[in-house]
Design a protein with these regions (language model features):
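Structural microenvironment flanking redox-active thiols in thiol-disulfide oxidoreductases
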Residues: 95-148
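Short, positively charged
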Residues: 32-38, 160-169, 222-226
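N-terminal "domain-start" segment that seeds a small globular fold
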Residues: 33-70
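Thiol/selenol-based redox catalytic cores and closely related redox-interacting motifs
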Residues: 140-206
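Generic recognition of short, well-ordered alpha-helical segments
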Residues: 93, 126, 208-211
Length: 226
């Protein structure tokens, strides 16, 4: 069993050791090439900066009920986590790590934790159930919120073909029937709905560490007097 305090980077290293012997070499090569392509361009120039308003938008909760991101926050400061989907092993280990290390820390600070992906609501429910998540998991159909943040990307054809060989079709999983995904991103929003910290990861095998998020949250809480 993984120690709850194990950094995400260490969990990823273990996952990659396990998958190296499980995935066919051509599939690994396709994924590696697509990752290199995605990271080569750098952070998109239009990523929303700290100090601007957090985009709101219609989302669907894990039960299939329509709501909005602002309603989910309910006037609280929040850590909003954009992830790729329940099909992504890196997303699973990350959201599980956040459950183990962040939930109680954020609760005592009065901060909400919300995970957002473009997948259909049943994918959100699957993510929540298989990782025993107690925080809110919602679908952002069509990547409306992620798009306004400027954090969108799309898998290339070679990677899509590799995914299909594994029985994975993003067009069937995503609510809008496309292959568009958010870069893994954590956004800290204050109670007024202003972005105070944003951490975008072009490399989907890396994620914002819980310790980094807590440090950023404490700085925001100290400076903005929620």
């Amino acid at each position: 069993m993984t120690d709850p305090h194990t950094p995400i980077a260490d969990r990823v290293a273990e996952l990659q050791r396990e998958s190296a012997s499980r995935l066919p070499a051509d599939v690994r090569a396709a994924f590696d090439a697509d990752l290199a392509r995605a990271t080569a361009t750098g952070i998109p120039a239009d990523v929303t900066a700290a100090g601007t308003a957090m985009p709101d938008g219609d989302v669907v909760d894990e039960g299939g009920h329509p709501t909005t991101l602002a309603s989910v926050r309910a006037g609280r400061p929040a850590v909003v986590v954009f992830y790729r989907g329940a099909w992504c092993p890196y997303c699973n280990l990350t959201l599980r790590a956040y459950q183990e290390t962040l939930v109680s820390e954020l609760d005592v600070r009065g901060v909400a934790l919300v995970a957002v992906s473009p997948q259909k609501p049943d994918g959100s429910l699957s993510m929540q159930q298989k990782n025993d998540l107690t925080y809110t998991v919602v679908s952002d159909p069509g990547n409306q919120i992620a798009g306004r943040l400027g954090i969108l990307t799309a898998t290339g054809k070679q990677a899509r073909d590799a995914q299909m060989s594994l029985g994975l079709d993003l067009a069937d999983i995503n609510a809008d029937g496309t292959h568009t995904l958010p870069f893994p991103t954590v956004v800290i929003v204050d109670a007024a709905g202003t972005i105070r910290w944003i951490d975008v990861h072009l490399d989907y095998t890396t994620r914002s560490e819980p310790a980094e998020i807590l440090t950023a949250i404490d700085a925001v809480l100290a400076n903005h007097h929620f």
